[in-house]
């Protein structure tokens, strides 16, 4: 069953990208197990929880709201991993945060309404699962592995004004210079 919100307002930035927010939800601060949820369109496929930002909503607040609705978890919002663009089928610009899960609800909005499931994956396994049908979601985890993990001391990312934000597009791969990673 597909999710539909009749009162949903889509928000777009100045360049026409749909504004989205998502979280990589980790079981612990070691960031070795990530929570994925089943897609509302294709229930046998796994995705990173996230969705559209509401008017006047900050990206971090939207990310926390989306994981609560889609994954039924609450947690400690951490660093902004990056802002990712998807240009192929739809123009999306997604703010992706790291969240350490502190509370797991037994029943949550999307499990009750559309039968959404959630499952913990080792990061390597999650990348493999996502690469087939959601390569941009796999890129979130690839970027995390490339040097934004807490182990290397880059645990905080300064907030950047919109015109100076770091963007990673779905077309870009591991050929990024180390200064961008």
Swiss-Prot record:
Mg(2+) 3 binds at residue 66. Its EC number is 3.6.1.52. Binds 3 Mg(2+) or Mn(2+) ions per subunit. Coiled coil: none annotated. Substrate binds at residues 10, 18-20, 39-41, 90-92, 116, 134. Mg(2+) 1 binds at residues 50, 70. Residues 18-145 form the Nudix hydrolase domain. Its cofactor is Mg(2+); Mn(2+). InterPro entries: DDP-like_NUDIX, NUDIX_hydrolase-like_dom_sf, NUDIX_hydrolase_CS, NUDIX_hydrolase_dom. GO terms for molecular function: bis(5'-adenosyl)-hexaphosphatase activity; bis(5'-adenosyl)-pentaphosphatase activity; diphosphoinositol-polyphosphate diphosphatase activity; endopolyphosphatase activity; metal ion binding; RNA binding. Belongs to the Nudix hydrolase family. DIPP subfamily. This is Diphosphoinositol polyphosphate phosphohydrolase NUDT4B. It comes from Homo sapiens (Human). The lineage of its organism: Eukaryota, Metazoa, Chordata, Craniata, Vertebrata.
């Amino acid at each position: 069953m597909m999710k539909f919100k009749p009162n949903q307002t889509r928000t777009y930035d100045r360049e026409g990208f749909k504004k989205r927010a998502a979280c990589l939800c980790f079981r612990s601060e070691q960031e070795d197990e990530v929570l994925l949820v089943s897609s509302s369109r294709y229930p046998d496929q796994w995705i990173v929880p996230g969705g559209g930002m509401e008017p006047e909503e900050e990206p971090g607040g939207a990310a926390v709201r989306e994981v609560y609705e889609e994954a039924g978890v609450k947690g400690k919002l951490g660093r902004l991993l990056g802002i990712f663009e998807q240009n192929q089928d739809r123009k999306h610009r997604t703010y992706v945060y790291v969240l350490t899960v502190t509370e797991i609800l037994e029943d949550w909005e999307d499990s009750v309404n559309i039968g959404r499931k959630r499952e913990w994956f080792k990061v390597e396994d999650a990348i493999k699962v996502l690469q087939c049908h959601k390569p941009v979601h796999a890129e979130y985890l690839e970027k995390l592995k490339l040097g934004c993990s807490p182990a290397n001391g880059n645990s905080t990312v300064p907030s950047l004004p919109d015109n100076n934000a770091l963007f990673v597009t779905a077309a870009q791969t591991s050929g990024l210079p180390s200064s961008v990673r």
